[in-house]
Amino acid sequence: MPSTVLIAIDASPAAAALLTLARRYCRPDEHELHVLLAIDTTFTVHDQPAPYTAEELEEYPAACEEQHLGESAVADAVRVLQKAGFASQGAMVAGQPVEVIVGQAQELGCELIIMGHRHLSRLGRLLDPSISAKVIDRVEVPVLVGVAG
């Protein structure tokens, strides 16, 4: 049975470095990769990917844009990993990054978390150094911390 690995990304191009780390240290026949993007609840319009209404686009343009960027980043990451031969799934979850990452890692029974060490995108909070430190302090599994940028 494959080991489960959680990859916490953001919507910036720098997230590609985390996928590179995963491909370097994980093996398709040994690991199942779960891509996670934690999004601030301020920028959440829908719980699930869905088209935006004209009213939502007018009333919450920034939130619609951020959510769309996040959904695209997760889908792109999953595609890259699947193309490399990995069983991979992705999710964007609204909430505080530490809570989301720790919660998903526990729920999935992850044996490893891969994340960045500093803020890498305009989503702004996912990979802040304090976030990484808090995650490390709260989980009982190894955390592979990638270099940002």
Which residues make up each language-model segment?
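General small-molecule cofactor/ligand-binding pocket signal
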Residues: 34-36, 89-93, 144
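Structural beta-alpha unit
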Residues: 1, 76-113
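Short secondary-structure boundary segments
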Residues: 37, 116-118, 147-148
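Short, flexible loop segments at boundaries between secondary-structure elements
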Residues: 140-149
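A short acidic, glycine-rich active-site loop
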Residues: 55-72
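Short, hinge-like loop/turn segments at secondary-structure boundaries
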Residues: 50-54, 107-109, 131-132
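Glycine-rich, Arg-bearing micro-motifs that act as flexible, cationic patches
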Residues: 112-137
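Small/aliphatic-rich secondary-structure junction motif
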Residues: 1-59
